[in-house]
Amino acid sequence: MAAVSEVEVDGVVFPPVARPPGSGHAHFLAGAGVRGVEIAGNFIKFTAIGVYLEEGAAVPALAKKWAGKSADELAADAAFFRDVVTGDFEKFTRVTMILPLTGEQYSDKVTENCVAAWKAAGVYTDAEGAAADKFKEAFKPHSFPPGASILFTHSPPGVLTVAFSKDSSVPEGAVAAAAIENRALCEAVLDSIIGEHGVSPAAKRSIAARVSQLLKAESTGDVAAAEPAPVSA
């Protein structure tokens, strides 16, 4: 696979490769961007988010359908991001705080978005409700100052591993705060970031730009580094 570069988002550095908690595989940085909200005419940045995909598995899987597409084509196509979310390869998401958040603030917002999406799609059951409760429980005792990180490993069988870091590193052998077996939740957490109504359009643009380069390199056998994608709000 072609080499990839690091990405810096608001002073937060996402290295080109990570080995996430709960995984035996290296993951490459697919893209990164801010998550923010418009408040009284000002764009307030809350978190920097990096999305990593399993080396040796993600690019060949995505190439079957998306090889030859430009960055703009990928960025505009909800089906591309759906394939990233549901693809048969591991994903790893690192959420690093720009502003402080409590665990309850973060997990309440994520589960609220997930439950709303499930109910709208008619797929909400007691199993999803129980998974959302486990997710909130894992976050309850934690608070996240600027620079602290939340680490999600999304496995193809549908296990969401949750871990925490006091900084932007991914600690070797990090102990998971929770491993939640629920495919809907495992996919929904990532979908809430890069899906059709994802909270980080900047991360989506970055992923589209970088993955289109990697797909091009895969098809031509080129090993040049993926171009660093501009990451703006």
From Swiss-Prot:
Pathway: Secondary metabolite biosynthesis; flavonoid biosynthesis
Keyword annotations of the record: Flavonoid biosynthesis, Isomerase
Annotated InterPro entries: CFI (IPR044164), Chalcone_isomerase (IPR016087), Chalcone_isomerase_3-sand (IPR016088), Chalcone_isomerase_bundle_sf (IPR016089), Chalcone_isomerase_sf (IPR036298)
Annotated substrate binding sites: 47, 113, 192
GO BP annotation list: flavonoid biosynthetic process
The protein's Enzyme Commission number: 5.5.1.6
One GO MF term: chalcone isomerase activity
Keyword Isomerase: yes
Reaction(s) this enzyme catalyzes, per UniProt: a chalcone = a flavanone
One Pfam family, short name: Chalcone
Site (Important for catalytic activity): 106
Task performed by this protein: Catalyzes the intramolecular cyclization of bicyclic chalcones into tricyclic (S)-flavanones. Responsible for the isomerization of 4,2',4',6'-tetrahydroxychalcone (also termed chalcone) into naringenin.
Extra remark: Part of the biosynthetic pathway for all classes of flavonoids, a large class of secondary plant metabolites, many of which are brightly colored.
Stated family: Belongs to the chalcone isomerase family.
Name of this chain's protein: Chalcone--flavanone isomerase
Source species of the chain: Oryza sativa subsp. indica
